[in-house]
Amino acid sequence: MSSSSLTTTSSMDSVVDGGLDTRLSLAVGCCPPRRRPVLLFGEVLPSPEKKVAAAAVVAAGKRGREQRGEAEAEATTTRQRRSCKKGRRGRGDDDDDDGDRRSPSGGGGDEEGASRKKLRLTGEQATLLEDSFRAHNILSHAEKQELAGKLGLSARQVEVWFQNRRARTKLKQTEADCDLLRRWCDHLAADNARLRRDLAELRRSSSSPPVSGLAVATPVVCPSCAHDDKRRLAFATAAAAAGDMASN
């Protein structure tokens, strides 16, 4: 009796456990839960080969970033140099009022690229350009087209040549004015020094006591004025002698 009751109880427990497992399987998704693999302590740490590979990847990424930074810096420097060259090349006169800075309507990138190159002229072309510049230093659009046809050049090249020629003329005029002002400044400085010396001599002569009554009666004359009087006297004597020779 007791053995049969135990068998019945165990069978009922197995049925209950089976039903519970079935319900859990249906609730989860008709599949039993997966067990996570157990990793040992040695398997958790990366191997030396993986460490070397990871270090190589990091070093390669760092080198790539450095190379990109150097390339960007070089590109920035190149752009700055090009912009400075364009600014120096495009600098011209500020008083151009005939639209010389504008490109001709029939031109294009080819003419602009050709105008940036150094223009080599023959003797006849240079002479004709100089004559045209002396006649009119600023040309209209029609005059530029006509002169370009005579020279066998583009209108843009003629325009750039006239701009550079005007800039050189203005620079030479400025240098000449500076030279003239420098000479005048030196001349005035010399006159100032001479007048200071004369003033010092006059002060010394006026402060010294008179030696005799004749010295008191003698007027005090500036040395430079006395020199001018002597020069005028010599000039008058030479003019009188020349007049006498002409009358004879």
From Swiss-Prot:
Q: Where is the composition biased (Basic residues)?
A: 79-89
Enumerate the subcellular locations listed in this protein's record, separating them with semicolons. Answer: Nucleus
User: Which superkingdom is the protein from?
Assistant: Eukaryota
Q: Gene3D superfamilies from the xrefs?
A: Homeodomain-like (1.10.10.60)
Q: Has keyword Transcription?
A: yes
Q: Region Disordered: what ranges? A: 50-118
Q: Name one GO cellular component term.
A: nucleus
Binding region for DNA: 114-173
Q: Which UniProt keywords apply?
A: DNA-binding, Homeobox, Nucleus, Transcription, Transcription regulation
| Name of a matching Pfam family | HALZ
Predominant subcellular localization, coarse grouping: nucleus
- Cite the residue spans of the region called Leucine-zipper: 172-216
Q: Which InterPro entries match?
A: HD (IPR001356), HD-ZIP_Homeobox_LZ_Class_II (IPR050762), Homeobox_CS (IPR017970), Homeodomain-like_sf (IPR009057), HTH_motif (IPR000047), Leu_zip_homeo (IPR003106)
* GO MF annotation list: DNA-binding transcription factor activity, RNA polymerase II-specific; sequence-specific DNA binding
Question: In which family does this protein belong, per the annotation?
Answer: Belongs to the HD-ZIP homeobox family. Class II subfamily.
Query: What role does it play?
Result: Probable transcription factor.
Q: What is this protein called?
A: Putative homeobox-leucine zipper protein HOX26
Could you tell me which species this protein originates from? Oryza sativa subsp. japonica (Rice)
